[in-house]
Curated annotation (Swiss-Prot):
Subunit structure: Binds RAB27A that has been activated by GTP-binding via its N-terminus. Binds MYO5A via its C-terminal coiled coil domain.
Consequence when changing E32A: Abolishes RAB27A binding
A GO CC term attached to the entry: dendrite
Lineage summary: Eukaryota, Metazoa, Chordata, Craniata, Vertebrata
Disease: Griscelli syndrome 3: Rare autosomal recessive disorder characterized by pigmentary dilution of the skin and hair, the presence of large clumps of pigment in hair shafts, and an accumulation of melanosomes in melanocytes, without other clinical manifestations.
Listed name of the protein: Melanophilin
Molecular function via GO: actin binding; myosin binding; protein-macromolecule adaptor activity; small GTPase binding; zinc ion binding
Amino acid sequence: MGKKLDLSKLTDEEAQHVLEVVQRDFDLRRKEEERLEALKGKIKKESSKRELLSDTAHLNETHCARCLQPYQLLVNSKRQCLECGLFTCKSCGRVHPEEQGWICDPCHLARVVKIGSLEWYYEHVKARFKRFGSAKVIRSLHGRLQGGAGPELISEERSGDSDQTDEDGEPGSEAQAQAQPFGSKKKRLLSVHDFDFEGDSDDSTQPQGHSLHLSSVPEARDSPQSLTDESCSEKAAPHKAEGLEEADTGASGCHSHPEEQPTSISPSRHGALAELCPPGGSHRMALGTAAALGSNVIRNEQLPLQYLADVDTSDEESIRAHVMASHHSKRRGRASSESQIFELNKHISAVECLLTYLENTVVPPLAKGLGAGVRTEADVEEEALRRKLEELTSNVSDQETSSEEEEAKDEKAEPNRDKSVGPLPQADPEVGTAAHQTNRQEKSPQDPGDPVQYNRTTDEELSELEDRVAVTASEVQQAESEVSDIESRIAALRAAGLTVKPSGKPRRKSNLPIFLPRVAGKLGKRPEDPNADPSSEAKAMAVPYLLRRKFSNSLKSQGKDDDSFDRKSVYRGSLTQRNPNARKGMASHTFAKPVVAHQS
């Protein structure tokens, strides 16, 4: 049994003919229902008599259980009923040839009612099918019921078939069907409801259906689109009385439908009721149906459990699908946040690797010697560079040149220094590239035989090294600022309720020291002076470019004015004796005053 019924290929005449056939079917059902109601009334009266006779068992031994006539030998002998076990007279019972015994008239009527109401059949069919029959057709053609014969058919269908709201139908489809004109032949895919099965499969009385019918009669009068007659309300009055009487007694002929009846009235069902009702009386229709559903809920609590196994769960499936969709959207948002966190962790790991590399390559040997006494590759490179600088210093100090030659050397050395220092401020912001360039420049051989190297003084070599260290330190500080920014973002994510997994490597901080301005040494002291501290000239400091330029210009002007400038003692004291105690781990952290003047 499909959930949708496509009747778009039917013309209006064919649809009207189908509706007339369904209307005749409803009329026959109503007549049969009235007949069965009369039989049920008789059965109820007989049951009350039996209850009285069951209390007085000795009375049934002498009198008939139905007509209360005394038994007579050969004229009115007593016979026991095979159904109830009571004794009746010959006129109040009949022979059952298949069972080879007597059955009293009340038990025979009960069997007739059960066969006429098809309870013996629908108790098994309801567990297999949920919707079929003429009610399915009438629901599919609901859009065409807005015409002449529509209201009467709707009222009959509501009284005989529909006593529940839509469980798994789509409310939008019925709204489209109501909006279409009568002559429209567009395709209509209308939903089929759970309660379609009830009216088509049940010919017995249903009090909740009649209450729904009564609530729909005044609404049809109020609606401007409907043409009603007084016969519907007149027929509904006896149905209401019979339905209330049957609900109080709970007769055996009245059966309920456990699989279609809900245990509670949800807001979605009220919405479906509002769409099924005409515009004039939607509230009255919804209230009547809600009252009918309340009575059905009370009756369904006493049903066997095997009938509750095939309940239509389409509403639950739609709700579950909606919940799953919301879960998927939340999961997608959580996945995007997790991907951002993963990218941040990768960035942090990369920055930590760069910091580790810079600490291994840029940290002076003094800091490493204090932390660990093991000599590393950086110590070996620093020592080799120191030896080369000593050779250069000795070669330059041995040459005695005039002031003109020294001026020419200074003029040649100044563009060389600009070339070596100029590109450094424009270096790539990537820390790894700057560190690679620094290592490559430190490892480049400085041959004393090179004429360009002769023109460069020892102070220029030292200033170049200071520039490299300063640039590297600034890049390390920039990397640390990026790390702090990332940590602040992670803290914000954690404050928002997201969990951030730390990276595999522990967080390390840079051990780079903060360099102070370099010391050139006092001019009044010689390196061999006992007051001069060799360890005070050990640190290489970051000097700004403008100060370095001013320092070189002052040296050049002093060379011009005074020829008695002793270069050998001053420069050799600042370069060749660079922290001799660094390898022993006994370096002092005192610094000399930055005095730049020559002896007059």
